[in-house]
Amino acid sequence: MALIPYALARPFLFSLDPETAHELTVRALALTQGTALQLAYGTSRVNDPITLAGLTFPNRVGLAAGLDKNARCIDGLGAMGFGFVEVGTVTPLAQPGNPRPRLFRLPQAQALINRFGFNNEGLASFMANVKNSTFYRQRQNPNLARKPLPLLLGLNIGKNAATPIERATEDYLTCLDGVYPYADYVAVNISSPNTRNLRSLQSDEALDSLLGAIAHRRQALVAQHGKQTPIFVKIAPDLDASQVDVIAASLRRHGMDGVIATNTTLSRDAVKGLAHADETGGLSGAPVLAMSNRVIGQLRAALGPGFPIIGVGGVMSADDAVSKIRAGADLVQIYTGLIYHGPKLVKQAAALIKTSC
């Protein structure tokens, strides 16, 4: 599939059910991992290094979580020119997610609506896939060829749907224990709209309790593994300024290393009247750009300079990526833009950020 220009592949993919197209893409990327072709793609990655949270990112454009839920195609995705790739969300136990259909295209708006519900194969399978990747094996074997600035890997964690919200912290800590030694950074997903009550973890007391427990567990993990893995928290766009301030204060108070802004939105204002606009789930793509940038700007004002922000939501062009940096983000992630415009968007965005920001 890597041999086919995306402009030719897209009509075929868009003729399929959206989730079938998603699964086909993931399988194709998994099959091409480690090939000379994929490694060749990786050598053309835009070189624009930046150091944040103690990590040196090869460039400022990454893949958002959600495309590779089970860490099956880390190498294939990394070869698209990303500076970093985030996989997951993973939960302690395997779960099927919500019933199909659960992914919908809104092409007139360059948008998607999903209600996947953290469908994944569980932590044990997820970590086996991470360890089986060329990415991981190269890090373990200094005799294998390594790029001057290797791809960075974020592992995104969540809670099982069956876990009561009052016990959510247990799931996050279980996942943190499992992913910690292998991640360049850990992303704590408390903002998916597709797991019941998950977003309540963004409220003042619940967030303090969760982040306090995560910070405490990390102290033990640092002692156990001899490394301090940065922890980022992923938040929603459906927040007002006072809620953003509460979250920013909690991030600082508990020593979190960064924030990912934002997840999908529940708002349908920008897509009213379009087919599938009334489907339940999170809306991503072009309609989220302004909402996400607003939250990024509010976070930057609340957190001040120097606190790492990963901007995600609505990046459909290189100019959109630059707008996130100018709103206050340090790094940018892409997902829905990749579906609509293909891998060329990665390098276009990274190149324009390099020359404009």
UniProtKB/Swiss-Prot annotation:
The keyword Ribosomal protein does not apply. GO terms for cellular component: cytoplasm; plasma membrane. Pathway: Pyrimidine metabolism; UMP biosynthesis via de novo pathway; orotate from (S)-dihydroorotate (quinone route): step 1/1. SUPFAM superfamilies: FMN-linked oxidoreductases. FMN binds at A65, G66, L67, D68, K69, T89, N156, N189, K234, T262, G285, G314, Y335, T336. PROSITE patterns: DHODEHASE_1, DHODEHASE_2. Its cofactor is FMN. This is Dihydroorotate dehydrogenase (quinone).
